[in-house]
Amino acid sequence: MKQLGIASAFVAAWMVLVSPAFGEEFRVQELNHGPNGFFIFDPELVRIKSGDTVHFVAVDKGHEVHSVPGMIPAKGQPFSANLSQDLDVRFVEPGVYVFACRPHTPVGMVGLVVVGDPANIDEINPSSLPAKAKSKIEALLARVRNGS
């Protein structure tokens, strides 16, 4: 009985020490139609901690997700999925990451992942994006700045 108690205590301690290393998992759906319109990511803004994973799910086919060049932290890792394929991205470097769907960027299918402190927020310049995507990124950046 005493050995069982010691083993249980060891397992519990190990779980506490190891679980932060794995981080939490978040889900972003790639949709033709959702709560905020057509051709969207849901949610379009995800706030996470360093070490967390975002699972981009191609719920509706014909979408992909990629980080937008020049709109991620300087030491952040770019990411990209093939068309109609899911993608898991573990984020380590803090900051703001802009992501988009190549075929649907012109209609505003873009979003943000904010990892911890959004230190690079003032370096994000969406002016090179199509008008709808630019407008959406500006609105999402305003939400991050306002803490909403």
Give the residues covered by each predicted segment.
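Extracytoplasmic copper-binding redox domains, predominantly the cupredoxin/blue-copper superfamily
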Residues: 21-148
